[in-house]
Amino acid sequence: DPNSSPGELIEALKDADAAVPWLASIPLDVAKHLPKLKLVQLLTAGYDSVDVIGLSKLGIKVANNGGSNAISVSEHTVSLMLSVYRRMMEAWSNTKDGAWRSGVDQLPVRTEINGKTVGIIGFGNIGRQVSRRLSGFDCEVIYHDVVELMPGRDGELGAKAVDLDHLLRVSDIVTIHVPLNSSTRGMMGAREFNLMKNTAIFINTCRGPVHNEADLIKALQNDVIAGAGLDVLEEEPTDPDNPLLHMPTSIVTPHWAGGTGEGNERAVVFALSNLERVAENRTLLSVVDPASIFKLRDTRSLWLIP
């Protein structure tokens, strides 16, 4: 229960070898009273809801969902690309309001995704699934990630590694798939939006704070970029007066890209497999490396979602 007090959590988990928080966290002031706890198993790809480094100092490992929601998030990502390009929200509003196509023909020409250059920032489980889904659209896919793929994997996945600034300058669509930590918070800001084409669109289905929302709003208002498709925002739920909800060039969904029945089932199955590994004292899967976070947390380096 996310509303449980620290005392209630300690009582509930005092004999647990593993915990699977849902819509809640395991605070350090609770974890330090749980000497048997070995694993905090997350059902999400992101791990910003827990203090990985602090838990590791207590001998507790943190594992994410092992890419269980990668297909769900990648499908939602591509749907946002298409929706922004084809002005779906405006078309729906016109149709629903009985205007049909009246006024729609005066909108900027809708755009095909076919043949466009798509830049993927963060080429982990989700980024790679996005690349696979774009292959059917004959897109040129480029990516940036600090973790190099094994030789030959670029061609296998139909993507080419480039530096970040080049990706921003040449991409028609920029989509970001990184974990939220101190190195990625605000990594898409005014400088980055100004590097993008004024015809380019920005997609974010990972974590809201990786983009600077005020800078994104200004970029859209001033036609620095052409559009945005967002499943995440800096504050959730957002203020109903948030300009991003009222711009014809932006589409916002309520942080549910990964929330499909299939994705949820895979996440639960993966979590159960790791719980079995704890019970059998076997090697755990998809454990977040605290040493890497500690080493790289003050750089722009730890981008790959395991």
Regions found by a protein language model. Give the residues of each.
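Rossmann-like adenosine-cofactor binding region
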Residues: 28-30, 142, 146-243
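Rossmann-like dinucleotide-binding domain for NAD(H)/NADP(H)
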Residues: 62-63, 199-306
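N-terminal glycine-/charge-rich "phosphate-binding" loop or analogous flexible N-terminal tail
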Residues: 1-18, 138, 279, 295-306
